[in-house]
Amino acid sequence: MIPQVATLDFETKGIEARPVYPPKPVGCAIRLPGDRGSSYLAWGHPYENNIKEKDAKKILLDIIKNMPVLFHNASFDFSVGVEWLGWPVDTPWQNIHDTLFLAFLHDPRDRSLSLKPWADKYLGMPPDEQDELKAWILENVPGAHDHRGRKVKNPELFWGALISEAPGGLVGKYAKGDTDRTWEMFKYTWKRVIEEQGMLEGYNRERRNLRVFDGMSDEGIKVNRKLLGSDIKKYESRLSYLDKTICRKLGRTFDVGSGPQLADALDKADMMERWVLTPTGKRSTAKDNLIPNIRDQKLVNLLGERSTLVFYLSTFIKRWHEDSIGTDRIYPGFHQVRSTNEYGGGSSGARTGRPSSSNPNLLNVPKYKRVLEKPWGKNLPNI
């Protein structure tokens, strides 16, 4: 039998990285057991609000304390409730359902586990109200845009981050569509994943771990910024030495980090046995294509060390040092399953469902623990 749940979906201010997370809510869509449709409590929009924040808080607190609740991506919505509305952080896991987990168990190979694309594909519920809201924001909010990608200027002005700036009535139509989709998705996946495939144990495992993963993300990891800073100076000095040595070895001064310039220098010094070409016909300077074809072993060693050093400096050491400014902590997001940011593009989590992390990536656990500071009364594991 399908559990009777209250389906909830928060609309919030724009999402920022931890520790400035989760964002402040401006409204919440609700679909209670037995309801034929959803309602929307709007309290933080510029206009067309229908309830005071304190009254909405009482209603939502009563729901979370007295009945099971359903979200799509409970990690986000439950965190919003805990941070801003006083929800009990120790709410029993049995009372929190998540269609993101069910969608993953239904088919982890699906191109998208996001609510709207999934509901469109399996339930025939196209996101028409999203198009209406998007058009309003692009027309009425100065600077709003719909460009995706990591290199986009002013990502905070992406239309999906500005939903709180739209009128409560219009956002309510959009948000109610999401809770209706979530409830229909719950019924669809519960029948197929739980009743037909017997995967209740797997679903419950993900639910039990939900607050564990969120807790790790919220607490962050303390780092030794002083040591990181000295390491940056040391390894940047080593990188400069490697670049100068490589230039001397090849008989010319050039930017070793530039693929085309490195290829030209290797050619002129007659250091290549052969070139592996890219699909566009250019000489590939990717490590795996370059190293096996260089004639000089000392040059191979220099370029190999440089490649490793650049990777660790950019991916870990500098990133950790920058991200920990003001807090002495880094705040990676820990993920249970793959999920997609339906507004800004990109995804997090692993397709296989294994635990993963991002922003920054901590899958490569440091073997030497001197850069990490253990919390008081706790120990770091030996590796």
Name each region found by the language model.
Residues 62, 79-83, 104, 117-121, ...:
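Residue-level signal for well-ordered alpha-helical scaffold segments within enzymatic catalytic domains
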Residues 1-5, 10-78, 82-83:
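Conserved non-catalytic scaffold segment of RNase H-like nuclease domains
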Residues 7-8, 72, 96-101, 382-383:
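Conserved catalytic palm subdomain of right-hand nucleotidyl-transferase polymerases, strongest
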Residues 18, 28, 75-88, 102-106, ...:
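Short active-site loop/helix that positions an aromatic residue
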Residues 88-108, 115-117:
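Conserved beta-strand -> loop -> alpha-helix junction used to position metal-binding or nucleic-acid-contacting
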Residues 1-30, 37-38, 110, 120-127, ...:
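Conserved "right-hand" nucleotidyltransferase catalytic core of DNA-directed polymerases
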Residues 77-81, 112-115, 128-131:
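Switch/connector loops and helix/strand junctions flanking conserved nucleotide-binding motifs
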